[in-house]
Amino acid sequence: MQQADLTKRINELKLKRNAVILSHYYSRPEVQDIADFVGDSLALSQEAVRQDADVIVFCGVHFMGESAAILSPNKTVLLPEIDATCPMADMVNVEGLKILKEKHPEAPVVSYVNSSAAIKAESYICCTSANAVEVVNSLDADEVIFVPDKNLAAYVASRTDKKIIPWEGHCPTHHQILREDVLKMKEKHPRAEFIAHPECRPDVLELADHVASTRGMIVHAERSPAKEFIIGTECGLIHGLLKAVPEKTYYCVSEFACCPSMKMVNLEKVLTSLEKMQQRVIVPEDVRARAKEALDRMLAVKIN
């Protein structure tokens, strides 16, 4: 089926099912284009709550669909590709986290939303890359357990007086962005600003002109006087940047900055998901209720 035909059929089924399509910035360009809303993890969590649709088709990885199901239990949440998992989310397990909590009983657990529902249920509060610093600083505690991303934990630690106890996880896509990659791109494009995601290695962030979440990068590109940008995150964001600020030029920092899991969803899978109402994301109620408390606490934190 041609792309135009796929798009037409998807739109027809959206109306029939009273469905809405949500997509992360890292999805394929054509998937972002068919979506009703494209955003970062924080915005997508908020949008899942705001939408009055009966069905949410979540074009992203598994933890994103889980978050939508946690926050919107009365809606049917579908993942077009059930095998699209987040490697970083899989790096932390409940048993290990419980042991860490026993070692630090006074430390609340902050879980990055890039984690499973089960991990969120073991956490006091969640965070995204857009609000991690504000979330940690909102806590009445001297030390904080931060899971699963050690790089984001290091970034937060540099911006708080609290002791951060990190889990040893990381995003493989961002972790593959090396300092040498940045230096080469800076030499090739000396007038370009380097904007980086806080999931990058600390020595990469040292070279950044600006550090931000994916949505924060778009906002920065809109406001900055710079005309060129080296983008230190997953390459899919460039599509969103070009749509938001088309008059500027963007360079992906590395050819390896591509998340295979986020690229698994295509238009054919979105269509099949709507046709067959699959794959539905189910979160057990006991887990969902506890995870929702952590997400609700996050959503209540005001960010600058």
Curated annotation (Swiss-Prot):
Family: Belongs to the quinolinate synthase family. Type 2 subfamily.
GO cellular component term of the entry, any: cytoplasm
Gene: nadA
Reaction(s) catalysed by this chain's protein: iminosuccinate + dihydroxyacetone phosphate = quinolinate + phosphate + 2 H2O + H(+)
Keyword Transport: no
UniProt cross-references to InterPro entries, sorted A to Z: NadA (IPR003473), NadA_sf (IPR036094), Quinolinate_synth_type2 (IPR023066)
Cofactors: [4Fe-4S] cluster
Keywords from the named record: 4Fe-4S, Cytoplasm, Iron, Iron-sulfur, Metal-binding, Pyridine nucleotide biosynthesis, Transferase
The UniProt record lists the keyword Cytoplasm: yes
An individual GO BP term: 'de novo' NAD biosynthetic process from L-aspartate
Residues where [4Fe-4S] cluster binds: C86, C171, C259
Pathway it works in: Cofactor biosynthesis; NAD(+) biosynthesis; quinolinate from iminoaspartate: step 1/1
GO molecular function: 4 iron, 4 sulfur cluster binding; metal ion binding; quinolinate synthetase A activity
Assigned EC number: 2.5.1.72
Localization of this protein: Cytoplasm
Protein name: Quinolinate synthase
Source organism: Methanosarcina mazei (strain ATCC BAA-159 / DSM 3647 / Goe1 / Go1 / JCM 11833 / OCM 88)
Listed Pfam families: NadA
Record note on cofactor: Binds 1 [4Fe-4S] cluster per subunit.
Residues reported in the UniProt entry to bind iminosuccinate: H24, S41, Y112, V113, N114, S129, H197, P198, E199, T214
Function field: Catalyzes the condensation of iminoaspartate with dihydroxyacetone phosphate to form quinolinate.
HAMAP family: NadA_type2
